[in-house]
Amino acid sequence: KELLDADGDILLNGGXYYIV
């Protein structure tokens, strides 16, 4: 599942952090 952070970053359940 992909969750959007308040900053708009996508947090992956795999533990990876992707900044969009």
From Swiss-Prot:
Keywords: Disulfide bond, Protease inhibitor, Serine protease inhibitor. One of its GO terms (molecular function) is serine-type endopeptidase inhibitor activity. Coiled coil: none annotated. Inhibits trypsin and alpha-chymotrypsin. Belongs to the protease inhibitor I3 (leguminous Kunitz-type inhibitor) family. Heterodimer of an 'A' and a 'B' chain linked by a disulfide bond. This is Trypsin inhibitor A chain. It comes from Albizia julibrissin. The lineage of its organism: Eukaryota, Viridiplantae, Streptophyta, Embryophyta, Tracheophyta.
